Amino acid sequence: MSERTEQESYTDKIDEDEILAGLSAEELKQLQSEMDDIAPDERVPVGLRQKDASHEMTVRDCTEPESEEEIDEDEILAGLSAEELKQLQSEMEEIAPDERVPVGMRQRDQTDKPPTGSFDHRSLVEYLYWEKESKRMLEEERVPTTLLPSQKTNEEHEAKNEDKVEELELVYEEIVEEVEGGQGDAVVDEVIEEVIMEVEEEDKVCDKPVKTDLDATDPTVTSEDGLQRPSESADANVEAKTDQSGLDTETKVNEEKKEDSTEPAPSSYENWVPEKEERVISKLKIPKLALGGNTFVKKTARPSGNETNLESTLDKIRNNNPSVTDVNLNNIENIPKEMLLDYVNSLKKNRHVKTFSIANTGADENVAFTLANMLKENRSITTLNIESNFITGKGIVAIIRCLQFNETLTELRFHNQRHMLGHHAEMEVSRLLKANNTLLKMGYHFELPGPRMVVTNLLTRNLDRQRQQRMEEQKLQQMKEQRKVMEMYEDSLNLPPGMLEMLGGYIPLSLLQNCQNGAEDIPEDSPEPSPQPSPPHQLCKTQHLAPQQHPPNLSTGNLFEEVQLKKTPKRRDPLLEWNQCDERKDGRPNVHLRSVPKKRSIAREGPVDERANLKDMIKTLKPVPRRREPPKVDLTPRDHLLSEIRQSNVAYLKAVPLPKILESQETSLF
């Protein structure tokens, strides 16, 4: 109780009024702010209990002129270098950022690397435009839409307006700081200038003087917030000049200043005014893609990079121009469907186009059916590429069905369609391809393993047939060349035509040597020299049939002694023929004579008989089997026991002695 009474007596001794009376105005404000934080007023909403720091700062600045007189900010700023000013500016942006700037844009630029190129605002806007258009085109592909008549008329009006002169509107936002002071105060005024520039002509720039107006509603800005870096403002000015180069501009200026401005205080930093910051809002003319003046080309189509001139190429195909052998329309998404159908129809009678590619052109079922009809009549196209389109299984099946009437197409590609082909369509494709013998390549991955294997086997079959045809053509070419060689030798040897063929293609070596000697002895003045003999590799077949040695000193008259001629039936002598009437009268029997082949000399038929006898002897021989003896294996007692058990019978059991190896002390009975 004693302690409590002491505390009460101590509080009674403290007079709050005297304490508050002894405090200065600054201490009273500080005490009030602390009391607002410790015990806020409950009648004030929670969201409004936060104290206004900016108001306190302004009041403190107004109520403390003495402290500001002691610190001269202008002198301090004037003594700083350009690098120190930049560092101070960056630090002030981090400590007290501008509340009018969005939070996401308050991050300062921390890159030290110099820019690789100048900033191109126009290219950035075009890039954003094409990004937006690509998304819109994807949405159009997902949900097909049809334009109403009112929408079509609106688009026509927009197209007409785009043809007129576009206006480029540039809005410059200039921040001008003026250091003004009164009674030792340094107040910085912010002047915002908006420059609206309109384009009229090129290569002319007109500048007008700046008009200033005062407005009391502009908030006060401190020197820290309004300080601008000279280098950044200069860069912004250079960017603005690059954007407005070559454009005629008209400027209209509105400026705002703070009310009750006083004369500027003398300082070495007061004449410096930062460069203006420019905010450019431009209306750009998007290029309208006109393809050969066609009126039904999409206005929002993306550039494909394909430089094919559609109209001139179509005219060449219709006129059957032989210079056009490869038609490439890939990635032209804005090609009209009517023009695509005209291309396909014009290829029906064309005889020179070998490759036709329409990948990623938006081809649909109508184009697929037209392609099928074209393949029935066309006899020149070898490669067809219709990948990345909107063709369904029905269109693909129609094209494959028409391949049974086409014998020139060797490569077909239809992969990556918008819709799946389907299992039924894959089975139908594998079935229809059996009737085609010329297709060698197919650009499609089958989902089912069955059709995949069937199509693979069919393409392999077609490749084998093509290889066989190529081999047959080579054989025919070789036969033609050999026939020419034989005719050449017949002419050189003065033999009747077909003589060497009757001889089985055999040409004696002596004839060849004489032909070569004769060809060498022919004078150069002879008008028709005998043809030279063919290379030895073409005569190897004719020489190895009956190789014989001939003496080198044979005369030209005995050349045909070694040639074996075929025997032809002799004609009967009419003097020796009997008259049939006389035979009937005399009653003589009819006698029919038949020719008996003469026996050849033994000397000539000797080697032939020996060969025949040798062949007969070889036929009588039989292969002698090599009977190898089985390897000797020593049988163990266990094997003997098992063999005896296998040979024994249940009805006739007999005692079998136990082998000594199997005996042991456990099994022994004694």
Swiss-Prot record:
Entry-linked Pfam families: Tropomodulin (PF03250)
InterPro entries noted in UniProt: LRR_dom_sf, TMOD
Residues of the WH2 domain: 637-656
Record's GO cellular component terms: cytoskeleton; M band; myofibril; striated muscle thin filament
Keywords annotated in UniProt: Coiled coil, Cytoplasm, Cytoskeleton
Subcellular location: Cytoplasm; Cytoplasm, Myofibril, Sarcomere, A band; Cytoplasm, Myofibril, Sarcomere, M line; Cytoplasm, Cytoskeleton
PANTHER family noted in UniProt: LEIOMODIN-3, TROPOMODULIN
Function: Essential for the organization of sarcomeric thin filaments in skeletal muscle.
Name this protein carries in UniProt: Leiomodin-3
Source organism of the structure: Danio rerio
